[in-house]
């Protein structure tokens, strides 16, 4: 893996994406200095903005609604800080959203994991024009008649970047059906700030394809899904340095960048083999797996009394089935430990007679759990675990699958005045009990993005909370 190329690309791509997103925001009157109102000549569903050229910039229809949502998001963030910081936070958020989508699609297309089996960012023949742009209607993406006509006309006019933008958004929305935690529906303000080119050799897409060797993504040629984690760590290089350089208090927003550290492979293997691996070997010493584990340490000689206690423990472990094992990484980052744990669990399942296809589904459902305070790291951990499952089960993305990795959320923005509506339709005893439980949970999760997994979350009656009807439920009935 060429980590120098990966690092150089990630750092450069972050700055490039932020610059591009900021430029697109400026076109619609949104800058770090403030939000401009549309020009007076705006009418109906069309808005005009002064960008210093002879003709004003205009948006209409859905783009107007997307701009309104973008303003709403910035103003909501501004409640916790100042406008400039809120603006920078949202611009950074949009930039990393598209960065995550780009590197995920690159991994999927190189490994032929895309449902259409048609490359989105590159061409198998090496031409500049991506295969999806060449044959857009072979990918089985949903198009309206109007969209098909638009694509035909744009291709005829040789406006490849405009064709690519339409198709890229279509592909992201299609991937939402199989990987919803990473590929969000793009009919929001992030779509308004998307400016990608496939023909510009100074663009992010061109550099992604040409700067990082394709084999680094290809798992059949020595590549690993862990490249996603390395890209994310290097993406945070400059924010991390800036946070440390100010020599002051680290803000909540800066914690993910300054604490993100991609664990070296040998440490991951050592930890997993001597925890998860040892757990299984204690009860199944003849499974023959430890020969595959380079960093597994044999147990030291113990005193007779200790040996007797260990023998009792081994009896319990001997009754374990693979589905009984639960492994959690409470600060999972981009999922490096979980990905290797998936490999070890696969070996355990196979030693117990499972097929790779059944084992992959069971590992997702029963074995692997993860938490992180960083929403973007969570997205990549989710993606990495799902791609590892896809490696063993080519149909895993065809159906609904539960992946137990989560981003810790805090309760700061929840309006507790709304609790008076909670539990409508319940008797007073149940309603008060549910309300007390919910208030306790909200108290615990205050500033959870700062504390993360060190929080001590008490046991709650989840069945009561989940079944408590809300005002929306009552309206439905």
Regions found by a protein language model. Name each.
Residues 247-468, 472, 477:
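SAM-dependent methyltransferase catalytic region
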Residues 1-283, 386-410:
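Non-catalytic, mostly N-terminal accessory regions of nucleic-acid modification and defense proteins
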